[in-house]
Curated annotation (Swiss-Prot):
Mg(2+) 1 binds at D295, E308. The gene is ddl. Binds 2 magnesium or manganese ions per subunit. It is an enzyme of class 6 (ligase). Mg(2+) 2 binds at E308, N310. Signal peptide: none annotated. One of its GO terms (biological process) is regulation of cell shape. GO terms for cellular component: cytosol. ATP binds at residues 169-224. It comes from the Bacteria. Its cofactor is Mg(2+); Mn(2+). Belongs to the D-alanine--D-alanine ligase family. Pathway: Cell wall biogenesis; peptidoglycan biosynthesis. This is D-alanine--D-alanine ligase. It comes from Enterococcus faecalis (strain ATCC 700802 / V583).
Amino acid sequence: MKIILLYGGRSEEHDVSVLSAYSVLNAIYYKYYQVQLVFISKDGQWVKGPLLSERPQNKEVLHLTWAQTPEETGEFSGKRISPSEIYEEEAIVFPVLHGPNGEDGTIQGFMETINMPYVGAGVLASANAMDKIMTKYLLQTVGIPQVPFVPVLRSDWKGNPKEVFEKCEGSLIYPVFVKPANMGSSVGISKVENREELQEALEEAFRYDARAIVEQGIEAREIEVAILGNEDVRTTLPGEVVKDVAFYDYDAKYINNTIEMQIPAHVPEEVAHQAQEYAKKAYIMLDGSGLSRCDFFLTSKNELFLNELNTMPGFTDFSMYPLLWENMGLKYSDLIEELIQLALNRFK
């Protein structure tokens, strides 16, 4: 069978996607599959690369360009294609895409339209989970605890910033965190200690999205639960992000690889169980399928607050999601195989 590995993308998380794709390429079972590379450039061009039957020798195979003339064709050149040309009979798409235009339902909807099976969550779950505001409103209805928050629209901010300040400061206490509603991997996130910083943080968040969310800052540990399955949902024991900074940013998480993890997290058994139950409930409520990672805050009083649910978590070989499953006895290559089978079962 052919796996179409779709990676790159137009979002700010383009580079994370390339790292994740390389990890998948090195772990997939080539005795069962061939892998067709399809790269989406930062400006949205789709480039069909080589068909691989074995592990690549280096990462350069992923950095595709397209030739304008036959003379320009090089070792890592690809063919520029229209998105619909991705369609193939008896193939499955593995979209290792993060952030907007990747895990927000857009690619998923396109795959549904051309009737191709794909790994991961469907349109509804992807769209809802990508939007931090929508996630919070939906999960409130099933009683999953979350920190207090204030949604802010860019139009309201431009029209009456004073009212936005008053709303935020009337509901929350500094420090707060400001985030774009539709972005991941700590992109566009700021910790804020006063009104002046709040103004700067909102301007930064609105660079990435027309909607932002302001959340109450709390002293807490960060623990994460990995989720796997369609109707039969499984969860891992929590892992913990161990850090010595105010919050870990995009570079720390992916580029510099400076995040320290504790797997499993050192938490009471009842806390671990509660985190697993909340993660499963959130996954089911959002109509999850395939995979997700659910992130929580854990206070010194062992109170859990759901932070977010990621339908396509970082998938590098040093990312939390695969490491959590490895701790449960499911190695990376077998995890990839299970995700492929879950996708095929969903499309039967």
